[in-house]
């Protein structure tokens, strides 16, 4: 594993210093500030896949895209009891204290936790609660406190699912969040339970009520607004201090009917993927912010090239908008901070599930899954240093930085070109995805436009 170089810009360092021990975050006009009134620009990372596994993160998207589908695939091979053991080990390894420590050292000052409701309240037992989700959240919050990062709670998978996509763990044929009054009441009750538990926690940065609703809602999103207001009212019965983050419909970006604000400590959160990094791409949100004198937060973005990352962060920070990137770990990834390798046994399961391999024995499957869970541990991951350099150092400077130490005489590899911005450190025609497809055809080693492929040739000259 490559050693980690920590990219904390002067501006990042100042912000981290400013937020230390400064109390609750709050909305103040168009800015987020701490209790001293000092502006805080959130620079965050999302813990995607920890509580809500997604197929593309696990290389199962063609046959098990949602968390429920993934669990069913595993249980069909090793049974429910062993499946429970696997997920416990998976969650134990995927997010550790060391992950949070290193994210803080890289320059992040906040974490977004995508929550699955069923880790807090069982699917088949409405309004009853279990310990697992709360205990995981408590542990994460303790680490965030120690390393002074704000933790933003995000309901990523609401009861029934708030969209018809895998990211909400929606199950076709079952009533969605919008088709069940019980599901909506459960959502309200869960948020009140969370707010009661964390009301006095200064390192909770706020509550992101519902992630990426995607539903054809009537009357200018009235059902979404009504539910948001009901959740807000329930939270305010027990917690009057924390920020309420509000996302629009249609992947968080349609705020029709969601203005004006209904709370004096609210932030509008939009998401940004696969579009140009120009003022026009965020102008509608800026206008909404100015009209209603309310802060904005880019609550989710990423899944692109280093050059796109640099440009996106530069754009939003220039407009006093904090951000949170997606996501921190994936199998076979160059565009997350950590790349997770595949175990041989897990790869055999992928082949079986995709119809290209034979079914492994129960014990072989358990062994492969156990090893895969352990591979998610920070100590076993590869750190993608180039991504972090693009997100922090390159936003502040156009200077180059050596990718590695090169000595002459010696062998120099073209793939080890300097860290730096597009058109300065390197050039490639396809270097970002703005609805035009992939930016890298090799998908190894680095997350720039340069197309590298894995090479096993012996080094001779």
Q: How would you label these PLM feature ranges?
A:
Residues 27-34, 39-42, 47-243, 248-256:
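Active-site mouth of glycoside hydrolases
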Residues 308-407, 431:
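Aromatic-rich peripheral "rim/lid" segments of glycoside hydrolase catalytic domains that contact
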Residues 389-461:
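Extracytoplasmic
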Residues 1-22:
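Bacterial Sec-dependent N-terminal signal peptides
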Residues 41, 50-57, 277-278, 333-334, ...:
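Short, solvent-exposed loop/turn elements at domain surfaces
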Residues 24, 185-330, 335-348:
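Extracellular glycoside hydrolase catalytic/binding regions
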Residues 59-69, 282-286, 424-439:
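Short, polar loop/linker segments at the starts of domains and inter-domain junctions
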């Amino acid at each position: 594993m490559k050693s980690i170089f920590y990219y904390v810009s002067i501006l990042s360092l100042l912000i981290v210093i400013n937020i230390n021990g400064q109390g609750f975050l709050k909305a103040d006009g168009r800015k987020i500030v701490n209790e001293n009134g000092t502006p805080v620009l959130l620079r965050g990372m999302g813990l995607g896949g920890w509580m809500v596994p997604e197929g593309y993160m696990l290389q199962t998207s063609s046959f098990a895209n949602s968390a429920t589908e993934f669990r069913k695939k595993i249980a069909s091979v090793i049974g429910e009891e062993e499946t429970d053991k696997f997920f416990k080990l998976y969650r134990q390894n995927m997010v550790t204290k060391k992950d949070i420590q290193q994210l803080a050292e890289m320059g992040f000052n906040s974490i977004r936790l995508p929550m699955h409701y069923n880790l807090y309240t069982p699917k088949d037992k409405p309004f009853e609660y279990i310990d697992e989700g709360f205990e995981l959240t408590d542990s994460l919050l303790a680490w965030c406190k120690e390393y002074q990062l704000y933790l933003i709670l995000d309901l990523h998978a609401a009861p029934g699912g708030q969209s018809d996509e895998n990211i909400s763990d929606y199950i076709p044929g079952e009533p969605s969040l919008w088709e069940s009054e019980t599901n909506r009441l459960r959502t309200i009750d869960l948020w009140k339970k969370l707010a009661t538990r964390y009301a006095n926690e200064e390192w909770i940065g706020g509550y992101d009520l519902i992630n990426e609703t995607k539903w054809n809602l009537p009357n200018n999103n009235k059902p979404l607004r009504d539910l948001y207001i009901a959740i807000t009212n329930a939270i305010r019965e027990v917690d009057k201090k924390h920020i309420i983050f509000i996302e629009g419909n249609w992947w968080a970006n349609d705020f029709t009917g969601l203005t004006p604000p209904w709370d004096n400590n609210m932030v509008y959160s939009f998401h940004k993927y696969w579009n140009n990094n120009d003022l026009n791409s965020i102008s509608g949100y800026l206008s909404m912010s100015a009209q209603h004198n309310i802060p904005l937060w880019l609550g989710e973005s990423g899944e692109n090239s280093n050059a796109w990352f640099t440009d996106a962060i530069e754009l939003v920070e220039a407009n006093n908008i904090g951000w949170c990137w997606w996501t921190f770990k994936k199998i076979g990834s160059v565009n997350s901070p950590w790349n997770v390798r595949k175990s041989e046994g897990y790869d055999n399961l992928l082949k079986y599930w995709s119809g290209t391999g034979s079914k492994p024995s129960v014990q072989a499957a358990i062994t492969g899954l156990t090893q895969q869970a352990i591979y998610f541990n920070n100590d076993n991951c590869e750190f993608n240093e180039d991504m972090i350099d693009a997100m922090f150092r390159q936003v502040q400077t156009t200077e180059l930085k050596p990718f590695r130490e090169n000595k002459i005489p010696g062998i120099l590899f073209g793939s080890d070109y300097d860290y730096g911005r597009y058109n300065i450190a390197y050039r490639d025609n396809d270097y970002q995805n703005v609805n035009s497809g992939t930016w890298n055809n090799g998908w190894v080693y680095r997350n720039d436009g340069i197309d590298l492929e894995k090479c096993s040739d012996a080094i001779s000259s």
